[in-house]
Each structure stands twice: as structure tokens, then as C-alpha cells.
């Protein structure tokens, strides 16, 4: 028995929600360890669709304990709204099955406003954020001026913390020519929301340590993807947190030895939202077709995703930077019916072949993909639940991906339905 870390092995939107839900049946605890409510995921269970952003995927199963770790940035109003929406759908959610790290950093309205100001200031400098305040909240965390969940329980120190925060933000707002934030109004808003979120507050590192010692199975749920990691991604077109597997330790307060098996999720093709390099992007009818078949639109934002062929170079790199033991390959069925499929097996930069994605923004923009043509398949893979259900060429495609990325496929997903999953290696039993 081991714990399992789930991370995206591309630029996010790989289908982590379904895989986490599938694994959560075997877990006792599901933990979010980074990001915020910028990374939406959709679960389809018994014909019911649940759209989550901030909450762990395990929350739709009331018998599981869901946890939001200290590595997350936490919008209290978004949290309340998401909890209420689930309750309306008949899901039992409360402090008995959902906990939030008491030292989690809060996202406030001023963070969202600053995010939007920056994104809309100039198209040339836009990163393509969701404008939900994620980056500015992480900035305040690192700048040691953030307001954390535990601060809402201390009316003696909260006013001082607000003044310190606003000394920074009101200076920025004056520079942008917008109204300053009134400290009294912010204090009243926080006092109003506090009773709705404080019952969920807990010492998460301590809670998880006790659960681990009791032999409970813990599933760590990453948001976004490893290629959006602030250090190892396509900087500056990245998110503001670490998204690689190692963040599961720092984002929950557990030691690295507690993490266990690392499962990387990737699509059978590649997608990306927002700005930034994309070596295998298809700006043609094939890219449009993949996007239509795969319903490639953001859960939270509705933004259209850019689509391209599978990039083995990128996934191989994330296998290494996250220490991935096995892959969950999703949306294989979207490639049904293609005569041929292209797979990126290498890069060319300024006329020379290279074996990794360079760190520099300029070099990333000049990358040229080297393709290998793979024979497609006509028979459907949709709803397949065993290798015997798959066409021979589809199996060959999966095996070729394993060879190119240097990592075995542990799970194969052939539709949004959780039952349409082919298990090769159970991560909890690895």
C-alpha cells in the first residue's frame, strides 16, 4: 500500500478530475496542494456532472475526507459558492468531510482587480491568466504580507495585517489611477465571511501525519500541469506556483517520503490555454477537429484550448522533473478515425537537434518539432474497458508513447465516464 500523487504531465486540462475520482474510491483522503480556483475540472458520476475549481475531486464522495493544503491560495467567497453549489446538487459537504489548512493564503477582491489590471493593460505583456487573483495572492504570500485563514480568527491582529497589506496594494492602485481600498470596509467583509469558512480550518500537516500513521491512503491531487510550473514550465507563460510532484510535500506539510507513487496524466494529443510556446500546435482543420471532438473549452473560463499532436519530448521532460512512475493516458478516443497520426519525437533549434525544451523564452519560440508518422485506426476506442477492446493500431500507438517518454502507461481513459478506464497498474498497489 502506498500514497499516490497525481500531476498533469502537460499544460493542464489533461483529465485529472476523472482519474482522481476513479482513484478516490480507493483512497481515504484526497488533498489539493497548490493552485487556486483557476483550474477547473469536471466529474461525471452516475450521469451527474459536477464542475469543481477549488475543492478536491474527492469532495463529491462524502465518505472521503477532502483537504485543501497550505500550498493552495484560497478565495473564501469562491469556496462558499462552490460548497453551496454542491449542496444544491445533493452532495453532503461540511467540516466533517472537508478541511482547509489554517495557514492557507487568502485571495481577496483586490487580488482579482490587480490581476485584471495587469492583463488588460497591454496585449503585448499579457500572460493569459484567468484573472482570478492567483498570481497577486502568491506575490503577497512570498512578500510576507498575506492574510491567511487563521488570521480571521484573531480580531486583535487582523486590523494590523490589513493595514500592512494595503500599504502595498494602495500604492499600486494609486499608480494605476484607481480608488484605494478602505481598510475598514475590508475588515468588515472579512468579518462577515469568517463564520462561513473558519469551521473548516485545521492544522492540515498534523492531521495528515496522524492519518498516515493510522495507515490511511492519501491521494494528492495536483492542479494545472507540470509545464505550467513557475520554475520548470514555459516561463513566463506559467502559473504562479510549483505544479510538479514535489510540491505535494511542501503544499501539505508532509515529508517527501510520504508521497509514494507519482501518476502523471496526459492526453493522447496536446492542448494549451492562453499564451506561450506550443511546438506541435495545429492551426488548421485537424486542430479544429481535435478541439471539437475533445470539447476543448475551459471548465471555468470557457476559453478555447489550442490543440496539437502529442509531444513526447515535453512529456518525457515532465516524467523526469516530477519523478513520474506511470502515466494515465486520456482521450485516446478523440483520435479514432485518423488515417495517420503525428507524434513529436524531437526538436530542432536553429538547425541543430536538441533533446529537451530549452528554458529561454526566445529559444522556446524558435523550436521546430521533429515528427514521426504513426498509422491510425478506424475502429472505435470509445468506451473500451480492456486491452481486448482496443484496435491493434491504437495499442501500438500507446506502446510507442511509452517508448518515447520512458514511462509505462498505468491507466488508459477512453471516455469521460469513470467506468471507461483500462487499468494496467494500480498506483495504490505499486
Swiss-Prot record:
Cofactor note: Binds 1 Mg(2+) ion per subunit.
Superkingdom of origin: Bacteria
Catalytic activity: IMP + L-aspartate + GTP = N(6)-(1,2-dicarboxyethyl)-AMP + GDP + phosphate + 2 H(+)
Any Pfam family hit: Adenylsucc_synt
Chief localization: cytoplasm
Binding residues for Mg(2+): 13, 40
Keywords: Cytoplasm, GTP-binding, Ligase, Magnesium, Metal-binding, Nucleotide-binding, Purine biosynthesis
One MF annotation (Gene Ontology) recorded for this entry: adenylosuccinate synthase activity
EC numbers on record: 6.3.4.4
One GO BP: IMP metabolic process
Active site positions: 13 (proton acceptor), 41 (proton donor)
CDD domains in the record: AdSS
Binding site for GTP: 12-18, 40-42, 305, 331-333, 413-415
Binding positions (IMP): 13-16, 38-41, 130, 144, 224, 239, 303
GO cellular component, one term: cytoplasm
Pathway linked to the protein: Purine metabolism; AMP biosynthesis via de novo pathway; AMP from IMP: step 1/2
Functional summary from the UniProt entry: Plays an important role in the de novo pathway of purine nucleotide biosynthesis. Catalyzes the first committed step in the biosynthesis of AMP from IMP.
Similarity comment text for this entry: Belongs to the adenylosuccinate synthetase family.
HAMAP family attached to this UniProt entry: Adenylosucc_synth
Subunit structure: Homodimer.
Name of the protein this chain belongs to: Adenylosuccinate synthetase
Native source organism of the sequence: Nitrobacter winogradskyi (strain ATCC 25391 / DSM 10237 / CIP 104748 / NCIMB 11846 / Nb-255)
Amino acid at each position: 500500500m502506498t500514497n499516490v500523487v497525481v500531476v498533469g504531465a502537460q499544460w493542464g486540462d489533461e483529465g485529472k478530475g476523472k482519474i482522481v475520482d476513479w482513484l478516490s474510491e480507493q483512497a481515504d483522503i484526497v488533498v489539493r496542494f497548490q493552485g487556486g480556483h483557476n483550474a477547473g475540472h469536471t466529474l461525471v458520476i452516475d450521469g451527474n456532472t459536477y464542475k469543481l475549481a477549488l475543492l478536491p475531486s474527492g469532495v463529491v464522495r462524502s465518505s472521503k475526507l477532502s483537504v485543501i493544503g497550505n500550498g493552495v491560495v484560497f478565495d473564501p467567497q469562491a469556496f462558499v459558492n462552490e460548497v453551496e453549489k454542491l449542496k444544491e446538487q445533493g452532495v453532503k459537504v461540511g467540516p466533517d468531510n472537508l478541511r482547509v489548512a489554517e495557514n492557507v493564503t487568502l485571495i481577496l477582491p483586490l487580488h482579482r482587480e490587480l490581476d485584471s489590471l495587469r492583463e488588460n493593460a497591454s496585449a503585448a505583456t499579457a500572460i493569459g491568466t484567468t484573472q482570478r487573483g492567483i498570481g497577486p495572492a502568491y506575490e503577497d504570500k512570498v512578500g510576507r504580507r498575506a492574510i491567511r485563514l487563521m488570521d480571521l480568527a484573531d480580531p486583535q491582529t487582523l486590523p494590523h495585517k490589513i493595514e500592512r497589506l494595503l500599504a502595498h496594494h494602495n500604492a499600486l492602485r494609486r499608480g494605476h489611477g484607481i480608488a484605494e481600498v478602505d481598510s475598514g470596509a475590508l475588515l468588515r467583509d472579512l468579518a462577515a465571511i469568517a463564520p462561513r469558512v473558519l469551521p473548516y480550518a485545521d492544522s492540515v500537516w498534523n492531521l495528515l501525519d496522524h492519518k498516515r500513521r493510522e495507515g490511511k491512503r492519501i491521494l494528492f491531487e495536483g492542479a494545472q500541469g507540470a509545464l505550467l510550473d513557475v520554475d520548470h514550465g514555459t516561463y513566463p507563460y506559467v502559473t504562479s506556483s510549483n505544479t510538479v510532484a514535489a510540491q505535494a510535500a511542501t503544499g501539505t506539510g508532509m515529508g517527501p517520503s510520504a508521497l509514494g507513487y507519482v501518476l502523471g496524466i496526459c492526453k493522447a494529443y496536446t492542448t494549451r490555454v492562453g499564451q506561450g510556446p506550443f511546438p506541435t500546435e495545429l492551426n488548421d482543420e485537424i486542430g479544429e477537429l481535435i478541439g471539437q471532438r475533445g470539447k476543448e473549452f475551459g471548465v471555468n473560463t470557457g476559453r478555447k484550448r489550442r490543440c496539437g499532436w502529442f509531444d513526447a519530448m515535453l512529456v518525457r521532460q515532465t516524467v523526469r522533473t516530477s519523478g513520474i512512475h506511470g502515466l494515465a493516458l486520456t482521450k485516446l478516443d478523440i483520435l479514432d478515425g485518423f488515417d495517420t497520426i503525428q507524434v513529436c519525437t524531437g526538436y530542432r533549434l536553429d538547425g541543430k537537434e536538441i533533446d529537451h525544451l530549452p528554458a529561454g523564452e526566445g529559444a522556446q519560440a524558435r523550436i521546430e518539432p521533429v515528427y514521426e508518422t504513426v498509422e491510425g485506426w478506424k475502429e472505435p476506442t470509445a468506451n473500451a474497458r480492456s486491452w481486448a477492446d482496443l484496435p491493434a493500431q491504437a495499442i501500438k500507438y500507446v506502446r510507442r508513447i511509452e517508448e518515447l517518454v520512458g514511462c509505462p502507461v498505468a491507466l488508459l481513459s477512453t471516455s469521460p465516464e469513470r467506468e471507461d478506464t483500462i487499468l494496467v497498474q494500480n498506483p495504490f498497489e505499486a
